[in-house]
Every structure is written in C-alpha cells, then in structure tokens.
C-alpha cells in the first residue's frame, strides 16, 4: 500500500491510496459488509454506487466459522466476489459491544460465543492470523474500546494495554510475512494527554496508517471534534488517517476538514432499511404519509438507479409493505449519496472551494438533519 497526499487545504486532505487491487481516492467512505456482504446488495450494485473499498468484520466472520470456507475460495475477495480493496476490523468495538459476555486480560479476550454460548479466546496474534487468512488489504490491530464517560485512570489502563496489544499485533503481522497494510488504532478516551501518548507510541512502533478509535460512543459532538483537531496535526502526513465508525454526513465533513482520509459506518445502510434517506436538502423519512402521493424523484440531484427510475410514492409504498425491494432501492440511494458526498469533498479541495462547499452544505441541510 502506498499513500500519496495530493493537496492540503487548511487541514483538509485530498489523497490517493494505491493497493495491488486498485486505487482509492480520498477522502473515501467504506460501506460496512460485516459478514462479507453489504446488506441486500450484490457487489456489482455496491460498485455502481461509486464505492472503492469495503469494510468487513474479521471477528464476526471468525465467529461464524467461515474462515476455512473462505480459505477454500482463496481469500475473502473471491468468497464475496469483490475484487477491490477490503479493510477488516479486528473486533475491538464488537468486544466492547458485548462487554457483559467478555473478560479482558493482558493475554487477550475471553468471552462467550454470542450465538451458541461456547467459550472463546481472542488474542492480538490470533486476530492477525484470522485477517491474514482473509487476505485483507488493510489489517487492523486488536484494541480495546473504552465507553463514554470513563475515568482517566481506567482510560489510561485500557490505552496502555491497547498499545501492548498493538506491539504484539505488529510483531505477529510481520512474522506472517503479510505484504498488505497494518493500521494502528489511537485510543485514550476524551483525554488529550492519553491520546498524545497513544499517538507517540504508535508512531514509534511504525504502522502503514493510523486509525482513530473510541469516538462516536456517546460523547457530545464537540468532544469528538476537539479530539480530532488535537490528534490529526500530530500524525505523519504521508500515512492515511482513518476515523472508525463515524458517521452521519455532517460527521464526515467535520472529520474531513480536520484531516481525516477514510471513514466507515453502518448509518447509510441501516438507515436505508429503516426508511431514512439522505438527500441534498437533508433527510426524507419515506414512511411518512405525506409521501404517499408524491410522484417526484427522491432527489433530483442524484444520479443513482433509485432516483432515476422510481418515485417517492413508490418507495413509500414498498416501505409500508415491508417489501425487500424497498430496502434494496433505499440502500442503493443512501450509498450513492455518501459516495457523491466524498466525490464533492475531493472536488472541493481540487478546485479550492472547500469553505464554500461546507457553508452550502449546512445552508441546505440546517433544518432537516437529526
């Protein structure tokens, strides 16, 4: 993997990541395909939205005992018929999500299988082996994600252990002679001194890119913005920066303007299945009765398959009837919206209109976002 910074405008970055499997223009948004699928869509449909890279979850694929089946296909790319780059999440956030089922130790995480209740152990080394078998283009270290709020002492203890896990992940990754990329994950809660230490130590270890974890876990948006503004200037300019699990369109813009290159989140696909659709002027809640007789396009500025072929009234009908096609068409649109947003951000830097774009975005959506 090779990252090239093409342009920097007041902290916002325009870049390019070269993988063996293709090029990713940044800023970039990665749809979440937890089990090797972006829910309801084929990989061809995902690609048609402008998606360059997908995130899959190594932890969940491992829990489903799919590792050996995937190896029979060669790798995860062949298994799911996606031949662009794939990034895999190690499972740190999922471990955080099932905290009532786990016991975290220096060695790793002991937990009960959330499906069958069997005892399972996951170490940093095991996580590297799982992701190696998947053939991930970007591998994530195993870390611990702390909740919000958390006391300083607890945040420090967790962050220091995550650093030791990062060292072990780094060592095992290179023992496997993995030629793909390994990203470190910055932790430390809302405490700038802990974030500083995490950044410093991860840079000393040396990673191909740096992710910012432990955000969007319930903290006020202002806290997240302050942490991003504090961290990003400390990171190497020649390495990509990835904000994990964030978020809504305005979150992407705020992350980008502070120096983030890569994003992932379930929001566009999950919200699509719930009938919450992102449009140029904000959000359309398509199940609302006012759309029953609305024969206009969902978004006249959108070029996706859904907007080019179906009315709001039809999408309302599908949603009210709980038809699978509704979820599919909604997902196509929301993903295309996110990819158009990323393309607009790239264009704004290329043309020197970043500040104008941000102002226009908020002017259009001020009364509609939630």
Curated annotation (Swiss-Prot):
Class in the EC hierarchy, top level: transferase
Q: Which cofactor does it need?
A: Zn(2+)
Identify one Gene Ontology CC term for this UniProt entry: cytosol
Q: Which residues does the annotation say bind substrate?
A: 89-93, 143, 187, 214
The protein's name: Queuine tRNA-ribosyltransferase
Q: Which InterPro entries match?
A: ArchSynthase1/Queuine_TRR, TGT, TGT-like_sf, tRNA_ribo_trans-like
Described function: Catalyzes the base-exchange of a guanine (G) residue with the queuine precursor 7-aminomethyl-7-deazaguanine (PreQ1) at position 34 (anticodon wobble position) in tRNAs with GU(N) anticodons (tRNA-Asp, -Asn, -His and -Tyr). Catalysis occurs through a double-displacement mechanism. The nucleophile active site attacks the C1' of nucleotide 34 to detach the guanine base from the RNA, forming a covalent enzyme-RNA intermediate. The proton acceptor active site deprotonates the incoming PreQ1, allowing a nucleophilic attack on the C1' of the ribose to form the product.
Q: Which reaction does it catalyse?
A: 7-aminomethyl-7-carbaguanine + guanosine(34) in tRNA = 7-aminomethyl-7-carbaguanosine(34) in tRNA + guanine
Q: In which pathway does it act?
A: tRNA modification; tRNA-queuosine biosynthesis
Membership in a protein family: Belongs to the queuine tRNA-ribosyltransferase family.
Organism of provenance: Baumannia cicadellinicola subsp. Homalodisca coagulata
Q: Which residues bind Zn(2+)?
A: 302, 304, 307, 333
